[in-house]
């Protein structure tokens, strides 16, 4: 299977059905396919070929999806570029990826202009007009590029074509994780059709007929990826899964989460699936639902069937609050990373929610440092290993590839760095990233466990926990906390609140209050920035 080939077959059978919505823009599957084919022709005309890297430096929108699809069509490799990156970060990623083309929003053009002279491999610059100044010499307007090229004829493609997604760089410099296109496409096809109540097709040739039948029955996935498409959660769960099942991807216009915009769109487009990133997204949605009810204009969320989250903690309390307001929901909490998928938990009304406890994928294991498999109920801590569709490796980094992607007992695994125990029932109890573990007074403390406890204290809105060098303890547990508007929790109250839930040594030694806890656009914790807040406050 191959993303582009599957989507072409879908466009052939439901061409008049909607594929993409962004504000007033609506693209049918035929239009989506044609615009992507024009973009593919532009890439080829500029001298790009199979395996050429194409940077996507954009916010969510139809152009992101079209430019990506166009890259897949000509067997290129679209590369996600974080729209928060400033000059040096942008240069690093485009240089590291060997990018030959860059599609970018004009509001980001000033950054592009300052680095483009240091990127000699770039052959094509395409600027998407979003009201920015447009300052990049040699850049071509996106719509003019499409108009200036006939659609590229369809071609055959290989399942071992490379799909690549760059990591967020939370534990070092961003790295390109390379997968086989066939395995990636097949995995997401398997995930999508069961959401329609259909058995997953065993072969690509079955997809078009299944999609056509579902569309004729009015059975389609209508998705909002609330997370950025430049991250795996947004593009994999929020876009690839619905599109591979012939669905609709509806993107938000605001560039930071506006829960009211999201809920208005759920109502207007009869959205069935929502992709978020844990509590950071779920809490504002809950507040917006409550405010709308209080104002006498509740949102119609009756179409919404599933909320999917991945990437950060989604606590049991917040899941329960969401189900109290939208009772028909299925909440799917996935554990994974750019390097692999490891497990999930499913919560519905009447099924007790949990935090950081997941059913393992059949190919997931937990291994100790000496490569022994952790047994259920043993209490041992090990590193989570994801089997199944394992990446080729990291682009241009064989040493890190050898450390992360290893063979144990004849099976190849990915070790993204997550520590876990295995419960008596075989489920994973996720403890957190090994690189974030705090060693205080000889005890290992997992930040996520403390963060969850802090967030239960009255008045706390958000929290990250870091270790700060300390003469007495080695590292002092330090909570970086933001409060709800109007709340007045004190350091002592927060420390006491945690001690009422966890062993005393896990409680913060210090609490640093900030107006906003630092997180990436996808809701993931920015521990580097949080640690700097803590250092600045305790200097």
Predicted regions and their residues:
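Conserved AMP-binding/adenylate-forming core of the ANL superfamily
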Residues: 18-61, 69, 86-91
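Structural core segment of the AMP-binding/adenylate-forming
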Residues: 45-46, 76-144
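AMP-binding/adenylate-forming catalytic domain of the ANL superfamily
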Residues: 128, 503-525
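Gly/Ser/Thr-rich phosphate-binding loop
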Residues: 169, 245, 271-276, 286-354, ...
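Conserved AMP-binding/adenylation subdomain of ANL enzymes
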Residues: 185-226, 230-275, 288, 292
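AMP-binding/adenylate-forming catalytic core of the ANL superfamily
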Residues: 85, 91-92, 100-104, 387, ...
């Amino acid at each position: 299977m191959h993303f582009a080939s599957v989507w072409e077959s879908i466009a052939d059978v439901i061409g008049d059905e909607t594929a993409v919505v962004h504000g007033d823009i609506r693209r049918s599957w035929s239009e989506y396919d044609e615009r992507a084919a024009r973009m593919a022709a532009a890439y080829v005309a500029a001298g790009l070929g199979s395996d050429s890297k194409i940077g996507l430096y954009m916010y969510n929108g139809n152009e992101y999806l079209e430019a990506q699809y166009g890259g897949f069509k000509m067997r290129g490799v679209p590369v996600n570029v974080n729209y928060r990156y400033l000059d040096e970060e942008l240069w690093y990623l485009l240089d590291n990826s060997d990018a030959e083309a860059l599609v970018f929003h004009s509001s980001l053009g000033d950054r592009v202009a300052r680095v483009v002279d240091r990127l000699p491999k770039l052959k094509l610059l395409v600027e998407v007009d979003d009201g920015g100044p447009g300052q990049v010499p040699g850049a071509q307007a996106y719509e003019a590029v499409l108009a200036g090229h006939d659609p590229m004829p369809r071609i055959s493609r290989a399942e071992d074509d490379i799909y690549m997604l760059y990591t967020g760089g939370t534990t070092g410099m961003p790295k390109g994780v390379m997968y086989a296109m066939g395995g990636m496409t097949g995995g997401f096809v398997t995930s999508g059709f069961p959401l329609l109540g259909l058995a997953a097709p065993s072969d690509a040739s079955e997809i078009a007929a299944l999609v056509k039948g579902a569309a004729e029955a009015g059975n389609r996935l209508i998705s909002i990826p609330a997370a950025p498409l430049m991250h795996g959660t947004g593009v994999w769960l929020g876009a690839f899964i619905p599109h591979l099942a012939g669905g609709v991807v509806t993107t938000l216009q605001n560039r930071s989460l506006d829960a009211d915009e999201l809920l208005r769109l759920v109502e207007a487009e009869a959205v069935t699936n929502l992709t978020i990133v844990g509590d950071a997204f779920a809490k504002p949605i809950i507040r917006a639902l409550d405010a709308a009810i209080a104002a006498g204009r509740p949102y119609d969320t009756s179409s919404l069937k599933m909320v999917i989250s991945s990437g950060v903690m989604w606590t049991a309390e917040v899941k329960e609050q969401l189900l109290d307001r939208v009772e028909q929901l299925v909440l799917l909490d996935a554990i994974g990373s750019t390097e692999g998928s490891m497990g999930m938990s499913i919560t519905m009304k009447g099924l007790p929610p949990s935090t950081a406890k997941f059913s393992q994928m059949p190919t997931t294991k937990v291994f100790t440092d000496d490569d022994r498999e952790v047994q259920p109920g043993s209490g041992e801590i090990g590193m989570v290993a994801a089997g199944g569709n394992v990446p080729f490796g990291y682009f241009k980094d064989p040493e890190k590839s050898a450390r992360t992607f290893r063979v144990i007992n004849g099976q190849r695994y990915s070790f993204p760095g997550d520590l876990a125990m295995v419960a008596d029932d075989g489920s994973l109890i996720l403890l957190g990233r090994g690189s974030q573990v705090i060693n205080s007074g000889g005890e290992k403390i997992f930040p996520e466990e403390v963060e969850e406890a802090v967030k239960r204290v009255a008045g706390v809105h958000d929290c990250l926990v870091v270790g700060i060098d300390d003469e007495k303890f080695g590292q002092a547990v330090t909570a970086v906390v933001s409060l709800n508007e109007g709340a007045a929790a004190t350091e002592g109250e927060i420390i006491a609140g945690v001690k009422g839930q966890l062993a005393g040594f896990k409680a913060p030694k210090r609490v640093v209050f900030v107006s906003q806890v630092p997180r990436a656009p996808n809701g993931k914790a920015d521990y580097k920035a949080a640690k700097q807040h803590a250092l600045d406050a305790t200097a």
